Every structure is written in structure tokens, then in C-alpha cells.
Design a protein with these regions (language model features):
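Rossmann-like AdoMet
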Residues: 1-93, 97-160, 177
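A short SAM/SAH-binding and catalytic strip from SAM-dependent methyltransferases
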Residues: 159-178, 238
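Short phosphate-coordinating micro-motif centered on Lys-Gly-acidic
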Residues: 161, 178-204
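Short, well-ordered beta-to-alpha junction loops that form the rim of enzyme active sites
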Residues: 168, 259-263
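A short glycine-rich, Lys/Arg-flanked "PGG" loop and its adjoining helix->strand segment in the class I
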Residues: 179, 245-252
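Conserved beta-strand signature within the Rossmann-like core of class I S-adenosyl-L-methionine
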Residues: 188, 254-259
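A short, charged helix-loop
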Residues: 192-235
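Conserved small/polar residues in nucleotide/adenosyl-binding loops
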Residues: 279-281
């Protein structure tokens, strides 16, 4: 499918002008999602749940938390026995509306209220609007210490406990790579002469080229696939290593639990899977 032109809001046009008129797709995606005033997540306008823009397992009911809570309880109990005086933390990175945090607290309260009394809840969420929604949803857990912080702040003062990230990795900005004229190219988003958005393609920067080469060698994959046709396009998440390093740095002692859904790389990076994951401009 060939990309088509799309309208561009003034705030985004300002960012593009400041960048010289064009940015890599990853930067465009970051702005669209996380720009503090206008981004989908950054502005706090995202709505998750049956009546919202999309659903996650926790937004549909408490079953997901009920299945997770026995394992989390076992981890926290083990840590509690190892160091009875240590304050423990349950951290959720990217908590959405707060459904999972609320339901986990309720499940743990029912299973071991004495242990829960030693636990604080930490939500990694920068947006003030989302924080207010968390407060409203978590009113029943007002006996539990609750705080918000950034991942960088956690890295400076790592916790003892369990750090959870659920359906977060697929919201990290990605590069879009396209096979054109015999080479793998990086997709950019630019302003056209009419002030709208359109895509263009540029040679891979050396750093991105070396990263792809290294990961493909380690994972036994080939980009592009041998039978890829002209215009074959896929996504590439360069943000993953730095994100995992930052998330791991948030844990002084405990467990980092990351839950997401995807195909194995060998099944994902195939010729028939082109332009499937993102609706592009």
C-alpha cells in the first residue's frame, strides 16, 4: 500500500518546522503519542476500556489481576521473609487508567492483608490528567501509600519489589523500514508544499544500519526477507534496549515482569507481513 498525504495540525507543523521540515517516523510517532499538550497519551486524552478507544485485559475485568496476583504474592512474600524490615513496592510502568493496579491491590488485600501493610504502590505516569484519574479509581486503596514518579527517578532510587509493565512495549515509538530500489531505507515524515504530511525515504543512518545488522545476526533473521517485493515495509523498535535498561535499573532487588503480545521475529519479519501493524499516513 502506498502512503498518502494527510493533514497536519498546527502544533505538529511547528515541531516539524523546528526540525527542518522532516523527522524520522519514530520521532513523528513519539510526538503523536507523547507530546505533553497534544499527544494522545501525553495530553491525558487517551481512554482505555470498553467505552474507550481500545481495550486491554485489565480494562475488561479483574480476571487478569486475579491470575497474576498469586505469583506476585509469592515473590513479595519471599522478599518479605528475606528482609522483614524492608519496605516493598509494587510498581506499574504505564498504568493506563489504573485498572490493573486497583485489582492487584484488591486481590493482595484479600490474600494477605498483613503483607499489604508493608507495600507501597508506585505508578510511573507523567501526565497530570492521568494521575487524577488514578487517584479517583484508587480511592478504595487509600490506606496504601501511593506515589507517582518517572522511570528516571526510580533509577535514582530503585525499589525492592515487583515492577510490572503490561502492554507498554507496543506503544514505544518505532522506525519504519522500507525496501526500495535495492536497499533498506528509513521512512521519514515531512511537510509537503501544501502544509500537509507525507512520507519520504532516506538511507539508513550508520548507527541504525549497524544495529539492524547486529540484531539480525543474533536472532537469525534477514532484513529484508529474501522474497520481499519493492515497497515491503516493516517496523523496527530501536527503543527496546534502552527501555529495558532503564526498567531494570528501577529494581534494586526483586522482579521485573514485562507482559506483551507479539510474534517471534522469524515469523514476523517475512515478505507477506508488510504494512500490517501501523495505519500509516
Amino acid at each position: 500500500m502506498e502512503p498518502m498525504a494527510a493533514s497536519c495540525p498546527d502544533w505538529l507543523a511547528t515541531h516539524l518546522h523546528q526540525a527542518g521540515g522532516a523527522v524520522p517516523f519514530s520521532r513523528f510517532m513519539d510526538l503523536a503519542l507523547n507530546e505533553p499538550e497534544h499527544g494522545y497519551y501525553g495530553s491525558g486524552r487517551a481512554r482505555i476500556g470498553a467505552q474507550g478507544d481500545f481495550v486491554t485485559s485489565p480494562s475488561l475485568g479483574s480476571d487478569f489481576a486475579a491470575l497474576l496476583s498469586p505469583q506476585i504474592l509469592a515473590w513479595l512474600t519471599s522478599m518479605s521473609r528475606s528482609d522483614p524490615d524492608q519496605r516493598l513496592s509494587i510498581v506499574e510502568i504505564g498504568p493506563g487508567e489504573g485498572h490493573l493496579a486497583r485489582d492487584l491491590v484488591a486481590a493482595l488485600r484479600g490474600a494477605d492483608p498483613e503483607l499489604l501493610a508493608r507495600i507501597e504502590l508506585v505508578l510511573v505516569e507523567a501526565n497530570p490528567g492521568m494521575r487524577r484519574r488514578h487517584q479517583a479509581l484508587l480511592q478504595e486503596a487509600d490506606d496504601l501509600p501511593l506515589r507517582w514518579c518517572s522511570l528516571e527517578e526510580l533509577g535514582s532510587a530503585p525499589v525492592h519489589g515487583v515492577v510490572i509493565a503490561h502492554e507498554l512495549l507496543d506503544a514505544l515509538p518505532v522506525e519504519r523500514l522500507s525496501w526500495r530500489e535495492g536497499s533498506l531505507q528509513q521512512q521519514w515524515v515531512e511537510l509537503n508544499p501544501n502544509g500537509g504530511l507525507q512520507t519520504t525515504h532516506r538511507p539508513l543512518p550508520n548507527g541504525l544500519h549497524q544495529e539492524i545488522k547486529r540484531v539480525c545476526s543474533q536472532g537469525g533473521i534477514q532484513l529484508p526477507p529474501p522474497d520481499a517485493e519493492e515497497g515491503w515495509t516493516t517496523e523496527w523498535n530501536s527503543a527496546l534496549p534502552d527501555w529495558f535498561a532503564a526498567a531494570a535499573a528501577a529494581v534494586d532487588a526483586g522482579v521485573l515482569l514485562v507482559i506483551d503480545y507479539a510474534l517471534e521475529a522469524q515469523r514476523y519479519f517475512t515478505a507477506r507481513r508488510s504494512d500490517l501493524s501501523l495505519i500509516h499516513i
